[in-house]
Amino acid sequence: MTAVQDPTVQRRRLRVELRRARDAAGLRQADVAHAMDWSPSKLIRIERGDVSVSTNDLRALLNHYGVKDKGKVNRLLELARSARGSSFYDQYADLLKQGYKEYLAYEASASVIRQYDPILIPGLLQTEEYARGLFAGFGRADPENADRGWAVRQHRQEVHDREIPPEMRFVLDEAALRRHVGRGSAMRHQLERIKEYAAEPYISIRILPFTRGAHPGMDGNFILLEFADPNLDDLVHLESINSITVRDDTELIAKYLDRFVQLEELALTPEESIDFLDALISDVSLTDQPTNSAEKEAV
């Protein structure tokens, strides 16, 4: 399976190319907007990747920048066309937090994914039973929303089926592994799935046990996305109760990358983590777990 480029990512690629072309021409945004008879905000939105640009506007813009190479012009025109398409995640916009649709598009294009989570099993590692247990706990107990939520998870997890999957590095807090989510043997199946993923050459899973005490990740989860494409800046994903923030701030990314390295060093080694998982799997009860209290309220 090959990666499908989301329009959100294509807009981001195009914006980098256009900013480079303007810089190479030695032009300011205000001068370009005036010459094109555009409002300054239109060019700003295009260069930020907030909006698509028509092929006619793009041709005029490239001509103004002195870009004459036909191969480059055609490549950028094709990029603009693909940037105007629809995203798989558009149909789930009502289900996703603000900013999450954009994050998912970037995640699918990343070459390296680093994630720390103190509470939940990351979506890229979740089983269907675990995911549906989460939806119930979040108050999404109705079948339609649960089905749609799982469809989003499934689409994300298609990265595992690529010929060359991204490198994935996870640090999981013991709390996320011990919290029973779902019913019956759901949690045992989830732990077994994590163990299976840990055996994959492109995945590193380290467990941060309670015995490590206080640590740098206690103030929340985060995800770092690294891209092989020079036209895509690396990103950090931060989450609050109502929204998702995706930042390309170099200093902020360096701060969180340093934090992730600290957490990896503090966590168990991959081999020790497998032994830890084996012990947890043995401890998990095979009897039905009680229904989540949040699920009771939502039904």
Regions found by a protein language model. Give the residues of each.
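Interdomain hinge/linker segments and adjacent boundary elements that couple functional modules
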Residues: T2-V16, R20, A30-H34, R48, ...
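Short helix-to-coil "ATP-lid" hinge immediately C-terminal to the conserved N-box Asn in the Bergerat
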Residues: D23
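Short alpha-helical DNA-recognition segment
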Residues: G26-I44
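Short acidic (Asp/Glu) and glycine-rich catalytic loops that position anionic groups and cofactors
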Residues: D37, T55-R59, D234-E239
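Tryptophan-centered motif/residue detector
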Residues: W38, F88-Y89, F222
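C-terminal regulatory/effector modules of DNA-binding transcriptional regulators
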Residues: I164, V181-V299
